[in-house]
A protein has these predicted regions:
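Extracellular/lumenal and peripheral-membrane lipid-interaction modules
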Residues: 1-172
């Protein structure tokens, strides 16, 4: 992995801030960063949690649930931009498919215990600023910029194992 020197980070952050002011910027969020969050779910009745990025904005969470015996499950979400006016940069994960049928509630409950997740009905709203902050160039963005940033589009790149999040400034 290439390392950027501090002055390169500042230049990169400045370029991104300028692109946000002008229009929008696409930020890749690696599958492994998202997987670290999901596998950290604090629920002893879940184990072997994995996250996989798939075609068409789909994110698949799978693992095992303790129901007397350990039962394998898989839950597929479609990642989309949140409705206009949603505070902060976030992505909505709409429930698409579950196997077995009873898997959705316990997966949503486990996700809802995480600080960056909010459960609304059968979908999860995920704050992505946490993942973006982990990227080196984000340190050099002007203070308070993330308060005005909104997600305008979401897609996936399964080949590179990334969630592609397009950011723009609110009202701009």
């Amino acid at each position: 992995m290439e390392r950027l020197l501090p002055e390169e980070l500042i230049r990169t952050g400045s370029r991104i801030a300028e692109r946000l002011r002008q229009r929008s910027v696409c930020v890749p969020i690696p599958e492994r960063a998202m997987a670290r969050t999901v596998t950290g779910a604090n629920d002893p009745s879940l184990r072997h949690l994995t996250l996989r990025i798939s075609e068409g904005g789909r994110i698949v969470v799978s693992g095992e649930k303790k129901k007397g015996v350990w039962i394998p499950f898989s839950v597929t979400f479609i990642a989309v931009a949140p409705p206009p006016g949603t505070a902060g940069p976030s992505v909505e994960l709409h429930l698409e498919r579950t196997s077995p049928f009873f898997a959705a509630p316990f997966v949503l409950r486990a996700l809802g215990r995480m600080p960056e997740m909010e459960i609304i009905g059968n979908r999860a709203r995920v704050r992505v600023d946490h993942w973006i902050d982990q990227q080196g160039w984000a340190e050099s963005l002007p203070t308070g910029m993330f308060k005005r940033v909104r997600v305008t589009e979401v897609d996936t790149d399964p080949g590179n194992r990334q969630l592609l999040v397009t950011l723009g400034l609110a009202g701009g």
